[in-house]
Regions:
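Positively charged, aromatic-accented nucleic-acid-binding surfaces
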Residues: 1-38, 42, 63-113
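Major-groove recognition helix of helix-turn-helix-like DNA-binding domains
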Residues: 40-51
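Short, basic alpha-helical nucleic acid-contact segments in DNA-binding proteins
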Residues: 49-63
Length: 113
């Protein structure tokens, strides 16, 4: 008889937060990766549909704070808007189950900021 053992593997995702003019932003792709979302563009589309297109920034709106690895098409969202979106649970069915953990980390960051 074969012995089967389940090992809990915890993966850490580092999400870069950009501070610009006293506002905190995250890349939607980074949050999608942390949540295990396979289609980050669909994730960004969900944010637009849920909170409105104006909350997703790119192009001229991000030129003053995006990093050298980003381009004008890289979408950013305010951390506060990302928390709002995640709290609505719109994407529960497509995540790795870490939505509440991601919310907690973002809220903790905002409380210390």
């Amino acid at each position: 008889m074969a012995k089967v053992v389940q090992l809990p593997i915890i993966v850490t995702h580092n999400v870069k937060v950009v501070e610009h003019e006293n506002v905190s932003y995250v890349r939607t792709r980074d949050i999608a990766d942390a949540l295990g979302v396979k289609q980050p563009f669909e994730f960004t589309s969900d944010i637009r549909e849920t909170l409105g297109g104006q909350v997703v920034l790119n192009g001229e709106d991000t030129k003053d704070f995006r990093s050298g690895t980003d381009n004008a098409r890289t979408p950013y969202v305010k951390v506060s808007d990302m928390i709002k979106f995640l709290e609505q649970g719109v994407i529960n069915h497509r995540t790795n189950g870490t939505r509440k953990d991601v919310i907690a980390v973002l809220q903790s960051y905002m409380n210390t900021y």
